[in-house]
Amino acid sequence: MIPLTLSSPSLNRLVLSTSRYSHSLFLSNFNSLSLIHRKLPYKPLFGARCHASSSSSSSSSFTAKSSKEIRKAQTKVVVDEKLSSIRRLFSEPGVGIDAYIIPSQDAHQSEFIAECYARRAYISGFTGSAGTAVVTKDKAALWTDGRYFLQAEKQLNSSWILMRAGNPGVPTASEWIADVLAPGGRVGIDPFLFSADAAEELKEVIAKKNHELVYLYNVNLVDEIWKDSRPKPPSRQIRIHDLKYAGLDVASKLLSLRNQIMDAGTSAIVISMLDEIAWVLNLRGSDVPHSPVMYAYLIVEVDQAQLFVDNSKVTVEVKDHLKNAGIELRPYDSILQGIDSLAARGAQLLMDPSTLNVAIISTYKSACERYSRNFESEAKVKTKFTDSSSGYTANPSGIYMQSPISWAKAIKNDAELKGMKNSHLRDAAALAHFWAWLEEEVHKNANLTEVDVADRLLEFRSMQDGFMDTSFDTISGSGANGAIIHYKPEPESCSRVDPQKLFLLDSGAQYVDGTTDITRTVHFSEPSAREKECFTRVLQGHIALDQAVFPEGTPGFVLDGFARSSLWKIGLDYRHGTGHGVGAALNVHEGPQSISFRYGNMTPLQNGMIVSNEPGYYEDHAFGIRIENLLHVRDAETPNRFGGATYLGFEKLTFFPIQTKMVDVSLLSDTEVDWLNSYHAEVWEKVSPLLEGSTTQQWLWNNTRPLAKP
């Protein structure tokens, strides 16, 4: 799957930001709340406006245009009843705002969200996974990144202005709001849907024009107009993630977390990222499409822990599992009471402002101010702990730092790596059956649509042991649709698979023991010289990154150019990152690591991390090319160790043929030809035993034959 232009949940920060780097890591002092910011290797908290000009041959405009302007054939102005309805609420008692911001995220800053929380999609009609909508009394604008420009052009009606975030001349959402509102405007947000960092930066930018940020705790305006048609919240049962896949029991994970809490000089941590909660507790859910997580919050203290979750999802088995780990259950909606209770007992709270919503942090701030008078105001001693009946003895305070779970989860243990390797091989077998079927059908001139193809792939995957779900919506794009980077085919509007055009398929699966993500681009007939050249240069970038060796401590952005260099040589590029982290039977997009041109992410790649390798090239309204494998970061064997440094490299997890018909061999070096032939030999060796007794094995043999050197 395409890496986010910034690491998830980044687009809020991208469109609200005013500088390339995170400059507002500190919120205002909490008066009596002692606030410290601890620096760790960290992903960028806010995206920047991209000032570099594009070198792509893309025909997309760099400036903001309304959807009406893009579709000139549309002459009738659309009366958007949803916009009219939400604007009427601006003047309601307790609201009183001039603009309202609707982000993509839920209260946990999730990339994928339950249908009932898809508020931005509901209000705008744009269904891409990343974007921010802003509605004023007379304007409506939507920001999204380069993966979704073409999709947004198609889906937005003429009432909306499309803002191509990151392109030169395009303001961020906060800048635009500050400019279009009359001085003294009031900008409303749902504080549960914004990270504390994003809210603080927004507040700073609009304050320059004397605007006020208003937290609407008690009402979400989109929910008010959605009403009875809004889907119900998910209520599926939670399951235990088996220790043979997790590799580490809950007690061990909590012990490590508590040690880190105390090392930071704190006594508790509040966790809202759903994959972090699932990982720590060895639990999995199905509340969110494509991600095996459940809606919950987790508070871990030195001597106790509370899970805030809908109790109807908790089976007897899961209750026993949590009880054995010393975890008490609390209602999901009582999280703010839980935060208040921490302050009342004088907790020293570790908070990650890039992931915690501003409702939680503001509640803790207010509670600390309220309860601090109950403590010795002159006490400057370190935190001391008492038993749970007595509570804490220190003034309540907080420290901002990256969640330690993010790092622990990113570095896979042996059991997690084993599960990832095994699940990838089963996935490869399913893919082989699928591609063999698809090629045969296309050659028989079957009338297949992009949706037909995606549905059939799901059928093949569902036959594999341990299959749970897809890991994201399958990107099945024929011809020009392949250039829509996060294209999602719909039954009523998708294209037929055209054998005379390139076909791009980006797909993945969730298995009980691992998560997969793979992209292949093929031609069912004869590709043009242009298509072969572009494909080959993408392949060269893929090989260059796969073969990279680098010193320990190297951040991902240093490697990004490896994947682009071959394209750069002929003046081409692509508008997305090259690699994202991947969870082990968890989110297909995982931080803090990434491989991207955005050099604000200083997170070093470390042994045990998993990243994708997916360079691409796209010509709008023509074709798209992408080649993606998943890689495991591991120690590299080098003849020297300069300065005593450890060097790292990559081990492939994905084993599936790359179509050699698309390769212009004359462009490849001998080393690159050897890489491709060696890779295909490994594919045959590892996957063919899973295809014994099937005609698909012959298909795999045909597609893994060595490529002759020129």
From Swiss-Prot:
Pfam family, one: Creatinase_N_2
CDD domains: APP
An example molecular function term from Gene Ontology annotations: metal ion binding
Residues the entry annotates as binding Mn(2+) 1: 506, 517, 628
Cofactor: binding details: Binds 2 manganese ions per subunit.
Required co-factors: Mn(2+)
Name assigned to this protein: Aminopeptidase P2
Cellular component terms (Gene Ontology): chloroplast; chloroplast stroma; cytosol
Function field: Catalyzes the removal of a penultimate prolyl residue from the N-termini of peptides, such as Arg-Pro-Pro.
Gene3D superfamilies hit by this protein: Creatinase/methionine aminopeptidase superfamily, Creatinase/prolidase N-terminal domain
Quaternary organization: Homodimer.
GO biological process, any: proteolysis
Transit peptide, start-end: 1-79
Alphabetized PANTHER family for the sequence: XAA-PRO AMINOPEPTIDASE 1
SUPFAM superfamilies: Creatinase/aminopeptidase (SSF55920), Creatinase/prolidase N-terminal domain (SSF53092)
Family of the protein in this entry: Belongs to the peptidase M24B family.
Entry EC number(s): 3.4.11.9
InterPro entries xrefs: Creatin/AminoP/Spt16_N (IPR029149), Creatinase/aminopeptidase-like (IPR036005), Creatinase_N (IPR000587), Pept_M24 (IPR000994), Pept_M24B (IPR033740), Peptidase_M24_C (IPR032416), X-Pro_aminopeptidase_P (IPR050422)
Binding site residues for Mn(2+) 2: 517, 580, 614, 628
Residues bound to a peptide: 147, 486, 580, 589, 614
Top enzyme category: hydrolase
